[in-house]
């Protein structure tokens, strides 16, 4: 009897290991910024800069807005990602880069809704939307 219980336990453990990933795990990795702005008026990300975000498994986020480097902490609950302790360098850049910087900073100020479809991540905070790809 104990032998059968052990076999059932191992099978149940194997099945539970095959369940869907948590949303935080799917956020993990590097994402390149491709667009930003209100949902109905997206602006393409500046092509000649390496703007994007990297979500680590340890709950930290790092990246570049196209003007300044940034870092902070994130937590996920359902389809909400909450950013905290976000800091960035304080360089001044030309107007297009500063507009992109402002959009990234606006989304990272608090809690954003996120959606992943294929290789595209959408972060929305109030009226500001960031679109990123893997």
Show which residues each predicted segment covers.
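Lipid interaction determinants
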Residues: 4-134
């Amino acid at each position: 009897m104990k032998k059968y219980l052990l076999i059932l336990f191992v099978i149940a453990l194997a099945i539970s290991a095959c369940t869907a990933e948590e949303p935080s795990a799917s956020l993990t990795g590097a994402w390149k910024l491709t667009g930003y702005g209100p949902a109905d008026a997206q602006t393409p990300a500046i092509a000649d800069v390496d703007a994007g975000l990297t979500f680590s498994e340890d709950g930290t986020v790092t990246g570049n807005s196209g003007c300044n480097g940034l870092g902070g902490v994130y937590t996920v609950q359902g389809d909400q990602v909450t950013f905290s302790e976000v800091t960035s360098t304080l360089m001044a850049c030309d107007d297009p880069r500063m507009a992109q910087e402002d959009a990234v900073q606006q989304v990272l100020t608090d809690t954003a809704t996120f959606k992943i479809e294929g290789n595209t991540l959408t972060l929305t905070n109030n009226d500001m939307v960031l679109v990123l790809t893997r």
